[in-house]
Curated annotation (Swiss-Prot):
Homodimer. The gene is thrS. Zn(2+) binds at C334, H385, H511. Belongs to the class-II aminoacyl-tRNA synthetase family. One of its GO terms (biological process) is threonyl-tRNA aminoacylation. It catalyses: tRNA(Thr) + L-threonine + ATP = L-threonyl-tRNA(Thr) + AMP + diphosphate + H(+). GO terms for cellular component: cytosol. It is an enzyme of class 6 (ligase). Catalyzes the attachment of threonine to tRNA(Thr) in a two-step reaction: L-threonine is first activated by ATP to form Thr-AMP and then transferred to the acceptor end of tRNA(Thr). Also edits incorrectly charged L-seryl-tRNA(Thr). PROSITE patterns: AA_TRNA_LIGASE_II, TGS. Residues 243-534 are annotated as: Catalytic. This is Threonine--tRNA ligase. It comes from Shewanella woodyi (strain ATCC 51908 / MS32). Binds 1 zinc ion per subunit.
Length: 642
């Protein structure tokens, strides 16, 4: 007679074994109707799974985040069901859940078109509307193998052969005539899978290995209700408008081409953005007392082997040979910084030593994963390493955290999620060392009044880590900043300092990044601002336009005054109507549009309007220059009078 304990502490006793669905029905018909699955003693289970011992149970519905994930997974099976009806010859591979949706990898000789995707979605809708029951059957490995062999599902057979023990009992989910294999759980009824949309199709190698066959990956999104689906689609529509690749082309910021995949060709305005961002970080480095250094672009393979990076990163490293020596272009800066630290004897009085670099790094990312500025092969890290004693860890981490928040606030990012990754099973050092390291990070976060989530076991083998994930205006998450303790690399590369007792000690190394990659962060900013950069960051901050040729000399005078005040300004003397000029520079997202006619010239004024169409009226040029200069120095996010 199992006794079921519910989240509110109430208990229900049953005479026979029960399922989550039975318990939900015992509570009430409404809950039974809404029940998707159950969390039994902390483990997700199908609604039909039997509970035969005293257990704690949480009933999962579509209102729960877990419930939405489950229905998304079931939508992947629904996709498979519909796909096999339309293309019976297709072979199904895998169909997992991803952020906001799902996908299915499929082997089909016919290349899917948009018309095919539309037909597939239509068939999915038809099937879902029948509200058919999903039947779970658990049997032997051989039964599962025979089932898929009879259906010619070679990928499912391979998964069974290579990934599932013959002693296991795989779960098969029957969607009418369609059968899929999964750990589950899944929805008990397709009535829960009504609000979805297929989004796109792309190529994907089986098991992510380019030596294997290229499959077709169909992506979809699914939500608990119509409203949530609509909100998500609207957000995607807005994201498409803000796509940094599209805006980058419109504003002539950069381009990429096939001869240099994953490498950025910065154009004048894009490089202006890059340099302004670098200038800002460089000022922060001075504020927080960092040295700025520059290490070589490539180093001998021997050094990468000593640092341990060769074992973990060699496949992602670009290499070259010269005079019988193999060199690797650096994928990160840390080994080079240790080499700089090692030059000359260091005392405990020299610590903490904070070393920063705008390091040009390269990683041989798979071509299919490259995505504009967000995923590149050549990138610049705002990388820094702090060499300190163990007693200094907390104060140094605290300073790093403050620097991260100072930086993000300048760009308007206030929604920041912080996670602390703790000791993994395989690690160096003893528990005392890890206790001290983790406690130092916790105390640094607490001292800065920062809430954080602990990720048990997710730290690196050489030390715990803090991750900073910022959320943009579309509520997308971008993991950018990290503060990572490292108790291994300094020792591997022979870094030491002379302690107060004259003994040789190994320093603790703190890896610190704020933006991560400047290229990626600029991609984030382009989308966050939709190309409307704050004045201090904008490539061109003001453009001065004449109405007739009579004002040409005055336009030159105004531009010179602005430039003398450190304002990036240009002139537009074209023989075009002023309305045409204003529209063109508005599309270029120039913050301030200055118009001069005879009256403005006579009074030494400019007529000012913003790129958003706000008319600021006529202003003395010296006054305007002073206001903009102040706005730039403060790195204000808003334009004048906004």
């Amino acid at each position: 007679m199992p006794v079921i304990t519910l989240p509110d502490g109430s208990k229900r006793e049953f005479a026979t074994p029960v399922s989550t669905l039975d318990v939900a029905a015992d509570i009430g018909p409404g809950l039974a109707k809404a029940c998707i699955a159950g969390r039994v003693n902390g483990e997700l289970k199908d609604a039909c799974d039997i509970i035969d011992t005293d257990s704690e149970l949480s009933i999962i519905t579509a209102k729960d985040e877990e419930g939405v994930e489950i229905l998304r997974h079931s939508c992947a099976h629904l996709l498979g069901h519909a796909f096999k009806q339309l293309w019976p010859e297709a072979k199904m591979a895998i169909g997992p859940v991803i952020d906001n949706g799902f996908y299915y990898d499929i082997d089909l000789d016919h290349k899917l078109t948009q018309e095919d995707i539309d037909a597939l979605e239509k068939r999915m809708v038809q099937l879902a509307k029948t509200n058919y029951i999903v039947e779970k059957r658990v049997g032997s490995w051989q039964v599962a193998r025979d089932t898929f062999e009879a259906r010619g599902e070679t990928y499912k057979m391979e998964i069974l052969d290579e990934n599932i023990s013959k002693d296991d009992q795989p779960a098969l989910y029957h969607h009418e005539e369609y059968v899929d294999m999964c750990r589950g759980p899944h929805v008990p009824n397709m009535k829960f899978c009504q609000h979805f949309k297929l989004m796109s199709v792309a190529g994907a190698y089986w098991r992510g290995n380019s030596d294997n066959k290229m499959l077709q990956r169909v992506y979809g999104t699914a939500w608990a209700d119509k409203k949530a689906l609509k909100v998500h689609l609207n957000r995607l529509e807005e994201a498409a408008k803000r796509d940094h690749r599209k805006i980058g082309k419109q504003l002539d910021l950069y381009h990429m081409q096939e001869e240099a995949p994953g490498m950025v060709f910065w154009h004048n305005d894009g490089w202006s953005l890059f340099l302004e961002l670098e200038k800002f970080i460089r000022q922060k480095l001075g504020q927080y007392t960092y040295q700025e250094v520059k290490g070589p672009l490539m180093m001998d393979r021997v050094l990468w082997e000593r640092s341990g990076h060769w074992d973990k990163y060699s496949e992602a490293m670009f290499t070259t040979n010269s005079e019988n020596r193999e060199y690797a272009i650096k994928p990160m800066n840390c080994p080079g910084h240790v080499q700089i630290f090692n030059q000359g004897l260091k005392s405990y009085r020299d610590l903490p030593l904070r070393m920063a670099e705008f390091g040009c790094c390269h990683r041989n990312e798979p071509s299919g994963s490259l995505h504009g500025l967000m995923r590149v092969r050549g990138f610049t890290q705002d990388d820094a390493h702090v060499f300190c004693t163990e007693d200094q860890v907390q104060q140094e981490v605290s300073a790093c955290i403050k620097m991260v928040y100072d930086t993000y606030e300048t760009f308007g990012f206030k929604d920041i999620v912080v996670k602390l990754s703790t000791r993994p099973e395989k690690r160096i050092g003893d528990d005392d060392m890890w206790d001290r390291a983790e406690e130092a990070l916790k105390q640094a976060l607490t001292a800065n009044d920062i809430a954080y989530e602990i990720l048990p076991g997710e730290g690196a083998f050489y030390g715990p880590k803090i991750e900073f994930t910022l959320h943009d205006c579309l509520d997308r998450a971008w993991q950018c900043g990290t503060v990572q303790l490292d108790y291994a690399l300094p020792g591997r590369l022979g870094a030491t300092y002379v302690a107060e007792d004259n003994s040789r000690q190994t320093p603790v190394m703190i890896h610190r990044a704020i933006l991560g990659s400047l290229e990626r962060f600029l991609g984030i900013l382009i989308e966050e601002y939709a190309g409307k950069f704050p004045t201090w960051l904008a490539p061109m901050q003001a453009v001065v336009m004449n109405i007739t040729d009579k004002q040409s000399d005055y336009v030159d005078e105004v531009v010179n005054i602005l430039k003398e005040n450190g304002i990036r300004a240009s002139k537009d003397l074209r023989n075009e109507k002023i309305g045409f000029k204003i529209r063109e520079h508005t599309l270029r997202r120039v913050p301030y549009l200055l118009v001069v006619g005879d009256q403005e010239m006579e009074n030494k004024e400019v007529a000012v309007r913003t790129r958003d169409g706000v008319d600021l009226g006529k202003i003395q040029i010296s006054e305007f220059a002073s206001k903009i200069k102040e706005q730039i120095s403060l790195r204000s996010l808003n334009l004048l009078e906004e």
